[in-house]
Amino acid sequence: GPWNISDEKVPDLSTYIDFGAIRIPYLQGIELRVKKQRESNQVLGITVTYRSSSVEVEAFAAPKTEGIWSEVRADLLKGNSDAREVNGVFGKEIILPVKVEDKTVDTRIVGVDGPRWMLRGVFSGVAAGDSKKASDEAVLLNKWFSDIVVDRGSEPLAPRDMIPMHDVSVPRDSDNGGSGDSGEIPGRPKGPLGADQQVEVKTTLTRGPMFSEVR
Protein backbone atom coordinates (compact mmCIF):
# COMPACT_ATOMS: atom_id res chain seq x y z
CA GLY A 1 0.00 0.00 0.00
CA PRO A 2 -1.21 2.62 -0.38
CA TRP A 3 -3.80 0.82 -2.45
CA ASN A 4 -5.83 1.45 -5.58
CA ILE A 5 -9.56 0.89 -5.17
CA SER A 6 -9.50 -1.88 -7.80
CA ASP A 7 -6.57 -3.83 -6.33
CA GLU A 8 -7.34 -7.50 -5.82
CA LYS A 9 -6.26 -7.51 -2.17
CA VAL A 10 -7.58 -4.07 -1.25
CA PRO A 11 -8.33 -3.82 2.50
CA ASP A 12 -11.87 -4.23 3.84
CA LEU A 13 -13.38 -0.75 3.51
CA SER A 14 -16.29 -1.32 5.90
CA THR A 15 -14.39 0.36 8.73
CA TYR A 16 -12.76 3.05 6.60
CA ILE A 17 -13.55 6.77 6.63
CA ASP A 18 -14.70 7.76 3.15
CA PHE A 19 -13.62 11.02 1.51
CA GLY A 20 -14.33 9.85 -2.05
CA ALA A 21 -10.91 10.13 -3.65
CA ILE A 22 -9.28 8.59 -0.60
CA ARG A 23 -10.50 6.15 2.03
CA ILE A 24 -8.58 6.24 5.27
CA PRO A 25 -8.38 3.57 7.98
CA TYR A 26 -9.86 4.35 11.37
CA LEU A 27 -7.26 4.68 14.10
CA GLN A 28 -8.20 4.97 17.76
CA GLY A 29 -6.92 8.20 19.26
CA ILE A 30 -6.43 10.22 16.09
CA GLU A 31 -7.48 13.80 15.53
CA LEU A 32 -8.66 14.40 11.97
CA ARG A 33 -8.70 17.87 10.41
CA VAL A 34 -10.40 18.55 7.08
CA LYS A 35 -9.37 21.42 4.78
CA LYS A 36 -11.88 23.09 2.47
CA GLN A 37 -11.72 25.75 -0.21
CA ARG A 38 -13.70 28.77 0.93
CA GLU A 39 -15.62 29.64 -2.25
CA SER A 40 -16.53 26.17 -3.51
CA ASN A 41 -16.59 24.32 -0.18
CA GLN A 42 -14.49 21.66 -1.91
CA VAL A 43 -12.53 19.33 0.38
CA LEU A 44 -8.83 19.83 -0.36
CA GLY A 45 -7.08 17.43 1.96
CA ILE A 46 -6.90 15.97 5.43
CA THR A 47 -4.44 16.01 8.31
CA VAL A 48 -4.29 13.26 10.90
CA THR A 49 -2.60 13.88 14.24
CA TYR A 50 -1.56 11.09 16.59
CA ARG A 51 0.15 12.05 19.84
CA SER A 52 2.96 14.44 18.85
CA SER A 53 3.01 13.58 15.13
CA SER A 54 0.90 14.53 12.13
CA VAL A 55 0.57 13.57 8.49
CA GLU A 56 -1.13 15.67 5.84
CA VAL A 57 -2.59 13.66 2.95
CA GLU A 58 -3.58 14.77 -0.54
CA ALA A 59 -4.11 12.89 -3.82
CA PHE A 60 -3.11 14.26 -7.22
CA ALA A 61 -3.79 13.20 -10.80
CA ALA A 62 -1.01 11.65 -12.88
CA PRO A 63 -0.65 10.60 -16.54
CA LYS A 64 -1.66 7.14 -17.69
CA THR A 65 1.86 6.31 -18.79
CA GLU A 66 4.02 7.22 -15.80
CA GLY A 67 4.06 8.44 -12.23
CA ILE A 68 4.93 11.97 -11.15
CA TRP A 69 6.62 11.50 -7.77
CA SER A 70 10.12 11.48 -9.27
CA GLU A 71 9.63 14.85 -10.97
CA VAL A 72 7.83 16.32 -7.94
CA ARG A 73 10.74 15.16 -5.81
CA ALA A 74 13.23 16.76 -8.20
CA ASP A 75 11.30 20.04 -8.11
CA LEU A 76 11.28 20.01 -4.30
CA LEU A 77 15.05 19.53 -4.21
CA LYS A 78 15.61 22.23 -6.83
CA GLY A 79 13.35 24.74 -5.11
CA ASN A 80 14.57 24.18 -1.54
CA SER A 81 18.30 24.33 -0.91
CA ASP A 82 17.94 22.77 2.54
CA ALA A 83 15.90 19.79 1.30
CA ARG A 84 17.58 16.42 1.07
CA GLU A 85 16.63 13.05 -0.38
CA VAL A 86 16.71 9.94 1.79
CA ASN A 87 15.84 6.29 1.37
CA GLY A 88 12.83 5.48 3.54
CA VAL A 89 10.06 2.96 3.95
CA PHE A 90 8.24 4.48 0.95
CA GLY A 91 11.34 4.56 -1.25
CA LYS A 92 12.83 7.95 -2.06
CA GLU A 93 11.61 10.49 0.50
CA ILE A 94 12.35 14.18 1.05
CA ILE A 95 13.37 15.73 4.35
CA LEU A 96 12.41 19.40 4.19
CA PRO A 97 13.17 21.80 7.07
CA VAL A 98 10.45 24.41 7.65
CA LYS A 99 10.27 27.38 9.99
CA VAL A 100 7.67 27.21 12.74
CA GLU A 101 7.57 30.41 14.79
CA ASP A 102 11.14 30.93 16.00
CA LYS A 103 12.58 27.51 15.21
CA THR A 104 13.20 25.19 12.28
CA VAL A 105 11.77 21.68 12.25
CA ASP A 106 11.95 18.85 9.74
CA THR A 107 9.08 17.54 7.67
CA ARG A 108 9.21 14.26 5.78
CA ILE A 109 7.51 14.24 2.40
CA VAL A 110 6.62 10.93 0.78
CA GLY A 111 4.96 10.18 -2.52
CA VAL A 112 3.45 6.98 -3.86
CA ASP A 113 2.50 6.57 -7.52
CA GLY A 114 -0.58 4.58 -8.49
CA PRO A 115 -2.70 4.16 -11.64
CA ARG A 116 -3.19 7.79 -12.79
CA TRP A 117 -2.65 9.15 -9.28
CA MET A 118 0.00 10.14 -6.76
CA LEU A 119 -0.64 10.14 -3.03
CA ARG A 120 1.42 12.62 -1.05
CA GLY A 121 2.03 12.51 2.68
CA VAL A 122 3.74 15.27 4.68
CA PHE A 123 4.85 13.93 8.07
CA SER A 124 5.70 16.30 10.91
CA GLY A 125 6.61 15.97 14.57
CA VAL A 126 8.30 12.81 15.79
CA ALA A 127 7.17 10.92 12.66
CA ALA A 128 9.19 13.28 10.45
CA GLY A 129 12.43 11.58 11.46
CA ASP A 130 14.29 9.00 9.41
CA SER A 131 11.59 6.44 8.66
CA LYS A 132 14.10 3.59 8.76
CA LYS A 133 14.97 4.53 12.36
CA ALA A 134 11.37 5.09 13.22
CA SER A 135 9.78 5.92 16.53
CA ASP A 136 6.60 4.17 17.60
CA GLU A 137 4.59 7.11 16.28
CA ALA A 138 6.33 6.97 12.91
CA VAL A 139 5.78 3.22 12.63
CA LEU A 140 2.09 3.63 13.38
CA LEU A 141 1.54 6.56 10.99
CA ASN A 142 3.63 4.91 8.25
CA LYS A 143 1.39 1.85 8.53
CA TRP A 144 -1.72 4.06 8.56
CA PHE A 145 -0.56 5.86 5.40
CA SER A 146 0.25 2.57 3.66
CA ASP A 147 -3.30 1.33 4.34
CA ILE A 148 -4.97 4.30 2.55
CA VAL A 149 -7.08 3.37 -0.48
CA VAL A 150 -7.24 5.76 -3.47
CA ASP A 151 -10.25 6.00 -5.79
CA ARG A 152 -9.02 8.08 -8.75
CA GLY A 153 -12.34 8.10 -10.60
CA SER A 154 -12.66 8.47 -14.36
CA GLU A 155 -12.96 12.25 -14.71
CA PRO A 156 -10.30 13.93 -16.89
CA LEU A 157 -7.74 15.79 -14.80
CA ALA A 158 -4.44 17.39 -15.73
CA PRO A 159 -1.31 15.95 -14.11
CA ARG A 160 -0.78 17.42 -10.61
CA ASP A 161 -4.41 18.52 -10.35
CA MET A 162 -5.87 17.64 -6.99
CA ILE A 163 -8.30 14.72 -7.20
CA PRO A 164 -11.68 15.97 -5.92
CA MET A 165 -12.73 14.76 -2.48
CA HIS A 166 -16.10 14.94 -0.76
CA ASP A 167 -17.29 15.47 2.80
CA VAL A 168 -16.43 12.74 5.22
CA SER A 169 -18.55 9.63 5.59
CA VAL A 170 -17.89 7.82 8.87
CA PRO A 171 -18.53 4.09 9.22
CA ARG A 172 -20.72 2.85 12.06
CA ASP A 173 -21.16 -0.69 13.27
CA SER A 174 -22.40 -1.72 9.83
CA ASP A 175 -21.80 -0.34 6.36
CA ASN A 176 -24.14 2.57 7.05
CA GLY A 177 -22.14 5.79 7.10
CA GLY A 178 -22.44 8.91 9.14
CA SER A 179 -21.11 12.28 8.20
CA GLY A 180 -19.11 15.00 9.81
CA ASP A 181 -19.05 18.66 8.93
CA SER A 182 -15.83 20.48 8.30
CA GLY A 183 -14.78 24.05 7.92
CA GLU A 184 -13.02 26.16 5.37
CA ILE A 185 -9.67 27.68 4.64
CA PRO A 186 -9.02 30.52 2.20
CA GLY A 187 -7.32 29.76 -1.09
CA ARG A 188 -6.68 26.58 -3.03
CA PRO A 189 -3.34 24.77 -2.87
CA LYS A 190 -1.26 25.06 -6.02
CA GLY A 191 -0.54 21.33 -5.99
CA PRO A 192 2.03 19.06 -4.41
CA LEU A 193 4.70 21.75 -4.58
CA GLY A 194 2.71 24.41 -2.72
CA ALA A 195 3.78 25.59 0.71
CA ASP A 196 2.19 23.83 3.64
CA GLN A 197 0.53 26.19 6.07
CA GLN A 198 -0.50 25.72 9.67
CA VAL A 199 -4.27 25.76 10.07
CA GLU A 200 -6.23 26.70 13.15
CA VAL A 201 -8.47 24.16 14.81
CA LYS A 202 -11.87 25.75 15.45
CA THR A 203 -14.31 23.04 16.46
CA THR A 204 -14.10 19.42 17.54
CA LEU A 205 -16.99 17.08 16.82
CA THR A 206 -17.72 13.97 18.83
CA ARG A 207 -18.59 11.20 16.36
CA GLY A 208 -15.95 8.56 15.75
CA PRO A 209 -12.40 9.93 15.87
CA MET A 210 -11.92 13.61 16.61
CA PHE A 211 -12.98 15.74 13.64
CA SER A 212 -12.10 19.40 13.54
CA GLU A 213 -13.05 22.39 11.47
CA VAL A 214 -10.22 24.40 10.02
CA ARG A 215 -10.46 27.91 8.60
Annotate each language-model stretch with its function.
Residues L157-E200:
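Short, highly charged C-terminal tails/helix-capping segments
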Residues I30, F123-S169:
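Surface-exposed amphipathic alpha-helical segments
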Residues V72-R116:
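Signature of long, low-cysteine stretches enriched in small and polar/charged residues
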Residues D82-E101, R152-S174:
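Acidic-leaning, charged glycine-interspersed low-complexity segments
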Residues Y16-G67, G191-P192, D196, L205, ...:
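Secretory pathway targeting signatures of secreted, lumenal, and periplasmic proteins
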Residues K64-V72, D136-L140:
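Short amphipathic alpha-helical segments
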Residues R33-V34, G45-V48, V57-A59, I95-P97, ...:
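Canonical SH2 domain fold
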Residues G1-D12:
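N-terminal membrane-targeting/anchoring modules of bacterial envelope and secretion proteins
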